[in-house]
Regions:
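Mature catalytic domains of secreted/periplasmic carbohydrate-active enzymes
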Residues: 1-134
């Protein structure tokens, strides 16, 4: 039978499919559905003994501090600057929410850092956070 499932928590558009307290750009605050589907999935996985894996896009076209837009936007589209450190704090904040609000998480699948290959993603800091919380 099925051993695990992976669900998208946030894709490149930055829209969170979970109840994020860090941003209102999420399923709870911006849709009529107003249900946390990651919570629903976590509960179903626990009930059926299936490991829950979370897909999370590190690139975020919506967040004002994700600048420049990177390769997918040909480094264009925003006249403002942006604060990379602030964006990384935001990203790690959302990861903290995901790793502390939904029970046991089997793993995380990152995507999108390829969009800004030359950026300092500070992956060691993110990986240390994951291991600290998990």
């Amino acid at each position: 039978g099925m051993k695990y499932i992976t669900i998208t928590t946030k894709h490149h558009d930055g829209f969170a499919m979970f109840d994020s307290k860090i941003s209102d750009w999420d399923i709870m605050d911006r849709t009529v559905y107003q249900k946390d589907i990651i919570k629903q999935m976590a509960e179903a996985c626990k009930k059926h003994n299936i490991k829950l894996f979370l897909y999370y896009s590190q690139l975020d076209w919506h967040h004002p501090d994700y600048y420049p837009r990177g390769d997918t936007g040909n480094k264009s589209g925003r006249p403002d600057k942006g604060d990379w450190e602030n964006y990384l704090d935001y990203m790690n904040g959302q990861l903290t929410e995901l790793l502390t609000n939904y029970g046991e998480i089997g793993g995380i699948w990152f995507d999108g850092w390829w969009d800004k290959k030359d950026a300092d993603w500070q992956l060691r800091k993110t990986y240390d956070l994951i291991h600290e919380l998990h």
